[in-house]
């Protein structure tokens, strides 16, 4: 009889559960995250693409595709500060070469990184990756040539938002990084005004 009473109580509780929850207060929606970091602040803390061990890691017990660390944007941040390129005054899209892109430029091209070169990486207004499919006017007065190749958007020979495709040593480059005064698109190449003479 006692077990029957327990079963009856359980059945009653289960029957009343939907009625009780029907009158429970609805959870408040989560507040939208406020974007309150400037382009400069975001650039200083933004993690870049993966750096893989490659063949150098094999002798150390690493697979070639193991991640060794992450690229970053220290050299770009330092160059902007040194050359006095201030991006705090409006909404901009910054095409941001990572440190590896600066190293490649210094080793293979060698032209100085001037304010004019840096402004060639800046477009007025917030432009998402999808909006960069047409030629773009830059802050230095030049024009970046846009084209589509290998199902990717390119500007002057730089891929916008390069993403890894499968289990390989290809890296993911940050794209559409929102800031309170603009947006950052990481690129794998330092852009030089007037240097691009390739395809559209």
Predicted regions: what they are:
Residues 1, 8-28:
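N-terminal chloroplast transit peptides
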Residues 25-200:
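Mature, structured domains of secreted/extracytosolic soluble proteins
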Residues 6-12, 39, 114:
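Terminal low-complexity, poorly structured segments
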Residues 1-3, 86:
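Low-complexity, disordered terminal segments
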């Amino acid at each position: 009889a006692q077990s029957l009473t327990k079963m009856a109580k359980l059945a009653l509780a289960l029957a009343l559960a939907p009625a009780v929850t029907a009158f429970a207060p609805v959870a408040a929606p989560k507040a939208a995250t406020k974007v309150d970091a400037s382009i400069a602040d975001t650039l200083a803390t933004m993690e870049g693409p993966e750096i893989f061990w490659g063949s150098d890691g094999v002798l150390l017990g690493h697979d070639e595709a193991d991640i060794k660390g992450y690229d970053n944007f220290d050299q770009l941040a330092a160059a902007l500060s040194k050359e006095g390129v201030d991006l705090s005054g409006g909404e901009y899209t910054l095409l941001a070469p990572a440190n590896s892109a600066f190293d490649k430029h210094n080793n293979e091209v060698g032209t100085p990184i001037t304010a004019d070169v840096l402004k060639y990486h800046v477009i007025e207004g917030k432009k998402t990756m999808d909006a960069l499919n047409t030629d773009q006017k830059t802050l230095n007065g030049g024009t970046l040539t846009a084209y589509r190749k290998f199902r990717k958007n390119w500007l002057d020979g730089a891929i916008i938002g390069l993403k890894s495709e499968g289990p390989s040593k290809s890296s993911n480059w940050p794209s559409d990084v929102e800031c309170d005064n603009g947006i950052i698109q990481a690129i794998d190449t330092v852009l030089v005004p007037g240097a691009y003479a390739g395809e559209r």
